[in-house]
């Protein structure tokens, strides 16, 4: 079943789960309950969507059970849902809403109040966008609505209406680490095929229990953290934020979760709070979104956990490659998922690797509101593939500096301060230089960093002067996006200041 709603019904028919989704607020729902409640909510939602035509519906909510119900209610209505990153600020949010032609946004007064988001909501409302609050929907609920929903429930279970699988199921937005966010429309087919690719690669059984704290607006949070387990018949525990570093290891242990997805930045933050039995039930710890440092691999190995590093982009729904228990090379991001074609284009002045292009049924063919289609998607990543088919990310094409005519990978340079100060975050940026075109500046949270000692170490490691940072800046707290990635745009502003 390709359509998300068809898949949900099919899974419930052949594998009832009493608690398919739970959350930290003690909410839970079975898969049959998820179908019924999404129908009930969807029917009432139509009363609020006045003159909405076929516009996407915005969703601005955290990782809780009601968010999953809202999401599947839009799929029941065969509407496109656009998931808004509420951490990205009013400028980015209004830009995303405009690109997606959104009129209505579903949210909750309780969430707005607890998140201190009233100023944000006010700014968005001033631009004529309308909010639909879950509390208002609940007030409209009547006994008649419940009876109609029961009738529709059985009609959908046994005589599902024909749904369009070619249209966008969801709109997500690129993280905007290097430029303004782009709208990415993922069709039901995109999401279906990527789900099948991941299941085939990782061989995940229906007995697994997922712990998902990456947000719905994150492509891994939604696609791999929610849709994959729910539509495969696995249980999932939702947690509203990955930023509760002290709490999350304890909840993973308490919920007996067996699958956990995260990023290197967050995994580092959890380390001080991991106990002997924290991961005793964990079968899969998969990291993506950014390169996993060797020091992170080493620390988790001490806790008896092998980090399976993977790679993906929102435009690929999102998974492209992953290390598995059987096929694993540290430092790589694993082998390509089944049925993904790739090609590597040589780049002038680059000594190693090339620019990665991909295509497949999980990959988009154009961005939102852009009529120009592409046969191959340009990932913007410089990569190499070894003789065994393992993929290595060498860096972003935009994260290279041209110094004295030579292309220098900022990601490659970062490996050395990370080795020198393994317990700290270090990011290299490029700044203009009158002599050599560009120069490197290191930003780190290492207190009292000694640039001379670092450069001496890097020289001993065999690097030429072109690879040595010219300046160093201390930054106590690094800007991190809601997706768990470091905000390179803000760091570049700091470097230039």
Description of each model-found segment:
Residues 16-17, 131-173, 179-180, 203-209:
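Conserved pre-ATP/AMP-binding loop-to-beta segment of ANL
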Residues 28-32, 169-193:
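Conserved AMP-binding A3 loop
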Residues 42-88, 213-215, 407:
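Conserved AMP-binding/adenylate-forming
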Residues 105, 360, 366, 382-467, ...:
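AMP-binding/adenylate-forming catalytic core of the ANL superfamily
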Residues 134-135, 438, 462-486:
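AMP-binding/adenylate-forming catalytic domain of the ANL superfamily
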Residues 146-150, 257-262, 271-329, 341:
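Gly/Ser/Thr-rich phosphate-binding loop
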Residues 192-209, 217-258, 273:
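Conserved AMP-binding/adenylation subdomain of ANL enzymes
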Residues 329-339, 347-375, 406-408:
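Conserved ATP/PPi-binding loop(s) of AMP-dependent carboxylate-activating enzymes
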């Amino acid at each position: 079943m390709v359509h998300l709603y068809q898949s949900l019904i099919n899974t419930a028919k052949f594998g009832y789960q009493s608690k398919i989704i739970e959350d930290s607020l003690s909410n839970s729902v079975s898969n049959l309950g998820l179908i019924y409640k999404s129908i009930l909510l969807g029917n009432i939602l139509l009363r609020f969507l006045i003159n909405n035509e076929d516009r996407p519906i915005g969703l601005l909510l955290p990782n809780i059970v009601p968010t999953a119900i809202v999401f599947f209610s839009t799929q029941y209505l065969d509407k496109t849902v656009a998931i808004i990153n509420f951490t990205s600020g009013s400028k980015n949010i209004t830009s995303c809403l405009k690109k997606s032609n959104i009129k209505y946004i579903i949210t909750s007064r309780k969430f707005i109040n607890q998140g201190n988001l009233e100023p944000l909501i006010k700014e968005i409302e001033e631009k004529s966008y309308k909010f639909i609050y879950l509390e208002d929907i609940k007030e409209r609920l009547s006994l008649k609505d419940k009876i109609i929903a029961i009738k529709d429930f059985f009609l959908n279970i046994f005589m599902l209406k024909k749904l369009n699988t070619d249209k966008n199921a969801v709109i997500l937005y690129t993280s905007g680490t290097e430029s303004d966010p782009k709208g990415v429309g993922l069709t039901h087919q995109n999401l279906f095929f990527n789900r099948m690719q991941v299941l085939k690669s990782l061989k995940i059984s229906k007995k697994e229990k997922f712990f998902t704290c990456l947000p719905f607006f994150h492509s891994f949070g939604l696609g791999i953290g929610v849709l994959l387990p729910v539509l495969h018949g696995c249980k999932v525990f939702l947690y509203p934020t990955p930023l509760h570093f002290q709490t999350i290891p304890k909840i993973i242990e308490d919920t007996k979760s067996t699958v956990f997805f995260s990023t290197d930045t967050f995994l580092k933050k959890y380390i001080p709070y991991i106990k002997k039995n924290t991961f005793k039930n964990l079968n899969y710890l998969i990291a993506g979104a950014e390169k996993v440092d060797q020091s992170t691999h080493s620390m988790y190995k001490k806790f008896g956990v092998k980090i399976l590093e993977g790679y993906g982009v929102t435009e690929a729904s999102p998974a492209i490659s992953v290390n598995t228990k059987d096929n694993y090379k540290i430092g790589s991001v694993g082998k390509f998922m089944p049925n993904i074609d790739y090609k590597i284009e040589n780049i002038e002045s680059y000594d190693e690797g090339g620019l990665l292009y991909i295509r497949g049924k999980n990959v988009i063919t154009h961005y939102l509101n852009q009529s120009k289609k592409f046969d191959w998607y340009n990932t913007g990543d410089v990569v190499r593939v070894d003789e065994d088919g393992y993929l290595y990310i060498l860096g972003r094409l935009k994260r290279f500096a041209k110094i004295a005519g030579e292309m220098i990978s900022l990601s490659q340079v970062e490996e050395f301060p990370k080795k020198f100060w393994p317990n700290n975050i270090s990011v290299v940026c490029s700044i203009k230089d009158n002599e050599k075109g560009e120069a490197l500046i290191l930003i780190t949270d290492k207190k009292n960093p000694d640039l001379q000692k670092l450069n001496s170490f890097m020289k001993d490691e065999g690097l030429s002067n072109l690879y040595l940072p010219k300046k160093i800046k201390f930054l106590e707290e690094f800007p991190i996006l809601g997706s768990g990635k470091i905000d390179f745009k803000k760091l570049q502003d700091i470097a230039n200041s």
